[in-house]
Amino acid sequence: MRNSPVSPGPGYAPSRGAARTRKRGVARWLAYAGGVFAGAWLATQLYYVAQIAAWSVIDPGSSAFMRADAWRLSNAQPAVPIRHRWVPYDKISRNLKRAVIASEDADFANNSGYEVDAILQAWEKNRARGRIVSGGSTITQQLARNLFLSGERSYIRKGQELIITWMLETLLDKERIFEIYLNSVEFGRGVYGAEAAAQYYYRIPASRLSAWQSARLAVMLPNPKYFDAHRSSPYLAQRASVIARRMGAAELPASQ
């Protein structure tokens, strides 16, 4: 007579083999998900590289920041146009070039796209505040952010910004980086680039900007929308005087 199968009792527990099988399944799923994430990340980096390489000979039509601002304005303030016109580097006043360097990144011509001391100071300030309030950005870092990234402040986005900064410094010379920056940076509500700023504020081409006009425009860069609405701000005039005095020492990037 055959023995009847014995049913698991109330204290029955799955075998070690079954537990190992489940763990292997979870590990495979995690490996797959990690591979998909890594592949997507790599594809994104290759896209950035391809775009930047193309911009060594082709002028960018717009930036991610500009497109986001255009969308926002079209919904919130549809009467406000986007003003932007690309002009060659030699059609931008040397006064504006010197003023922007004096105001935003005094060592731009010689640094590698990063200022380690500024990054460390920003890190300490952010740590003290418990959130990101400062980025310690050079001109190249600002360009990386404006060309590709959102306005969100996070350490992940900051890391991506540093990677794109390295790409820009590797694939483009300093003069080209500065040319793209001057043609894409925000100078006011819907105002992008040196030519649009010169026409909007002074009704002249960017090539004719004076030292004082250039200093005022450069001072607006950290908060352009605010200063667009507060052009008579005492701070704007005071800070412009400081920048005007520093412009003579500002070193422009060498032509390649």
Curated annotation (Swiss-Prot):
GO terms for molecular function: pentosyltransferase activity; peptidoglycan glycosyltransferase activity. It is found in: Cell inner membrane. GO terms for cellular component: peptidoglycan-based cell wall; plasma membrane. Keywords: Cell inner membrane, Cell membrane, Cell shape, Cell wall biogenesis/degradation, Glycosyltransferase, Membrane, Peptidoglycan synthesis, Transferase, Transmembrane, Transmembrane helix. Pathway: Cell wall biogenesis; peptidoglycan biosynthesis. The chain crosses the membrane at residues 26-48. It is a single-pass membrane protein. Its EC number is 2.4.99.28. Peptidoglycan polymerase that catalyzes glycan chain elongation from lipid-linked precursors. PANTHER family: BIOSYNTHETIC PEPTIDOGLYCAN TRANSGLYCOSYLASE, MONOFUNCTIONAL BIOSYNTHETIC PEPTIDOGLYCAN TRANSGLYCOSYLASE. HAMAP family: PGT_MtgA. Belongs to the glycosyltransferase 51 family. This is Biosynthetic peptidoglycan transglycosylase.
